[in-house]
Amino acid sequence: VGRRLTSDVYDAYAYKLGLGQRTGVEVNEVVGRLTKKTDKNYTSSLDIQAAIGQGNTVVSPIQLATYAATLANNGTRYRTHFVKAILDTNTGEVLSETKPEVMDVIEGNGNTFALVRQGMTLVPSTISGKISSYPIAIACKTGTPQRSETYASGKHYLNAMMIAYLPAD
């Protein structure tokens, strides 16, 4: 699928989901990058790698959180914030409140987002540990990002990660 889509199409959707760009969060953040045909090391095999989040693709944890929230919101991407409101500790009065700001909307193709969300709700049952029996329905996706650095043996370092949102319903 990655070869047929090519990184051009894949990157366009990844960008709309919040990857490869600033999220708008209130603190400094890294932009990351998406694999592009203009990359110096580009070959068509990078299209396949980019489709699974590898190749020259680099994303930040806050971009992944934005991505998960966009899936949860049926393709509507909101500006990401760490703070919903600032309250006066003495009175409880709201001093400042963050208003939702739509950054992009991905027009779904039929029930695409529903299928993705449904798949994400099945993942916890495949994971051992407390997440599989958590009392609130969780939607998640696991991954194993590969780093460019290698061990002396030549094997790549791997990082375990997971994006999630709850409640899943």
Regions found by a protein language model. Name each.
Residues V1-D169:
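Beta-lactam-recognizing serine transpeptidase/beta-lactamase-like catalytic domain environment
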